[in-house]
Amino acid sequence: MATSDGAPVERYVHGYEDWTREWMARRTASGELGFLLPHLVSGMAILDCGCGPGSITIGLAEIVAPGQVVGLDIEPRQLEAAKRLASERAVSNIRFEQGSVYELPFPGATFDVAVAHFVLEHVSDPLRALREIRRVLRPGGLAAIKDPYYPAFTFRPETTELRRFGELAGMVRRHNGASDTYAVNLRAVLLEAGFERTEAQAGFENLAGNDEAARVLPMMLQNQVREPAFRETVLEQGWATEAELDAIAAAAPELARREDLFGFVVFVTALGWVAK
């Protein structure tokens, strides 16, 4: 999808309901950005693109204090939640701004580090976004990117409802202009965007039987099919009926109680350095 001037337009597949923000707010800088942390030092200026409710952004601010950290998001509700959390945590070296990763509202060479955590998976033109990220980085600056590789996502037991949800989620992502597989090309895309040097790794997160994450995942599925943006897209495109979506949601509580739950998520982490 695109605007009249050719700029990509995307819809965030998870939406912005309360459950989404609560789920995102569980994430921390130490838990999600281990591949970046060794490169951070006190006093750095950091941009967190697609900051969501701000939990990762706040962690970054605590790590590089007194360096200044900016959280950027396109959705006002996310920014309001982020500001509240920063106030509760009494973190002062941080601010939040509204904006698009395609048109960052900052002069060139403003930041030492830019982060995009589970953000570029949702955009139709990651190359354009990375070129814009590179523009606002200082010489020697570092971009840190993390995104999932959906074809390797695995969850058991593979119920009819779970399999159907996976199909619909992929259809919605692709309809919104995103790619399920772009993450494996991150090094190439970073180089094409003008970064001088890159690194990338694959990792995974276990969602094993008794872990809280495994129990939460089916309930996330339930909330997802009830989320207005997701549901509206599926119904408008004729991919499923109201009854099918309701059946998927209704199956989630029983799935969450299963003793044989198991799954894992594969993701790619990448670093790109600007020439000094």
Language model features: what each stretch is:
Residues 4-28:
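Class I SAM-dependent methyltransferase Rossmann-like catalytic core
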Residues 8, 45-49, 53-103:
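Class I SAM-dependent methyltransferase SAM/SAH-binding core
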Residues 12, 18, 201-263:
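C-terminal helical/coil "lid" or tail adjacent to the Rossmann-like core of SAM-dependent
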Residues 25-44, 59, 63:
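Conserved alpha-helix/loop element of class I SAM-dependent methyltransferases that forms part
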Residues 102-113:
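A short acidic, Gly/Pro-enriched loop at the edge of an enzyme's catalytic core
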Residues 112-125:
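A short SAM/SAH-binding and catalytic strip from SAM-dependent methyltransferases
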Residues 127-142:
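A short glycine-rich, Lys/Arg-flanked "PGG" loop and its adjoining helix->strand segment in the class I
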Residues 144-213, 221, 225:
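Conserved catalytic/acceptor-binding region of the Class I
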